[in-house]
């Protein structure tokens, strides 16, 4: 099944360290705290983890014989809200800037660069260095909402943003703008209504 949304709930697995002083009665709280410090708001191999909702399970933990500090490594399965752009995914973005040859837009932690030569020519035209929407002859400008299709993704582990290259498809409809606003609330609140899971 193809991914249909930029934001979704999923289950992931990671290794989490606990110091000997954290291996006490509320160990699960320390596991959650250390897990969040490791993955929250950072680029991982799966995307950006926006919120760790809960720990599903964890193993007994392993202390390496070469580890003289007594730190144990636990394999933790957890449920989280993730932001994961993929190729050919259509998303709504807010135009933040227009620089020579590019529209720079954003959706949450995803920065979108749209080259002027990568626009839907049925809906837009390049006139005097501006991209003009053919339906109303207005120039694309800062503050506009646009619909794009992701072409390429650049990530660096542990960074807070994902950079993408996209094709400009259309101006966003009112319903799409409302959906974009809901996504921005989702980023802040960390809750999601649907139960989509991509594992």
UniProtKB/Swiss-Prot annotation:
Keywords attached to this entry: DNA-directed RNA polymerase, Nucleotidyltransferase, Transcription, Transferase, Virion
GO biological-process terms attached to the record: DNA-templated transcription
EC number: 2.7.7.6
Matching Pfam families: SHS2_Rpb7-N
EC main group: transferase
Subcellular location: Virion
UniProt GO molecular function: DNA-directed RNA polymerase activity
Gene Ontology CC: one annotated term: virion component
Catalytic function, reaction form: RNA(n) + a ribonucleoside 5'-triphosphate = RNA(n+1) + diphosphate
Protein family: Belongs to the eukaryotic RPB7/RPC8 RNA polymerase subunit family.
Protein name in the entry: Putative DNA-directed RNA polymerase subunit L376
Annotated source species: Acanthamoeba polyphaga mimivirus
